[in-house]
Amino acid sequence: AYVQAKQSWWEDKATVYAQDEDGAYFLYDMACSAEDYEKLTVGTKIKVTGFKGEWAGEVEIMDATFEIMEGNFVAEALDVTAMLGTDELIKHQNEKVAFKGMTVEAANDAGDAFLYKWDGSGQDGDDLYFNVSYNGATYTFTVESYLCDNTTDVYAAVKALNVGDVIDMEGFLYWYEGVNPHITAVTAGEVASTKSEGVMTYAEYIAAPMDSEVVIEAYVQAKQSWWENQATVYAQDEDGAYFLYDMACSA
């Protein structure tokens, strides 16, 4: 397979994410000198011999040795957003993946957007844990500090997150008691439109001339009055607000 990222090296043991055209591998504590570790650049082809194991759902190759081969391959991140919550997702375990348009959720009852360590007991430089949601389900993602330490762009990006942000991400599809991706990049994502076909955006509504017909979708915030099958209502969406005066409405 081909090296996609190096997580760590310590006492002649390396932990590496590797992938080929068919799938991916997590190489845990593979025998590796410091000199050889420097040779394991992204795309390097290696032949690995070790033992297949599993820990908390993560399938890995342990107690391995390797040799460098001829060849180079860098995987493109596969968008697996739509696979979240399905049996299809685990088939891509350890691959380089992407998630698009996910919403940052509170990481704890205090409303923080991320935690140092899984329980919030850590400090700057430790792993970052944060929650993101898609289609009503919430997932915990991680910035693994051995892979991306506190000097990296992704570490800073996660520390700058706010609850409610919509983000795109890339990383490796790690598993720990369920999906727990190791994230390597975070960027601002696009908010998916929730408006029906033919409905104006707030910007289009503002630009519309007076006395022209408009079609909007919004959420009722308060009812001012009702009289003779006419209602006056305050409505709002994520982009702006509307005053609906004497709108036709039965009791």
Cite the ranges covered by each PLM segment.
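OB-fold single-stranded nucleic acid-binding module
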Residues: 2-251
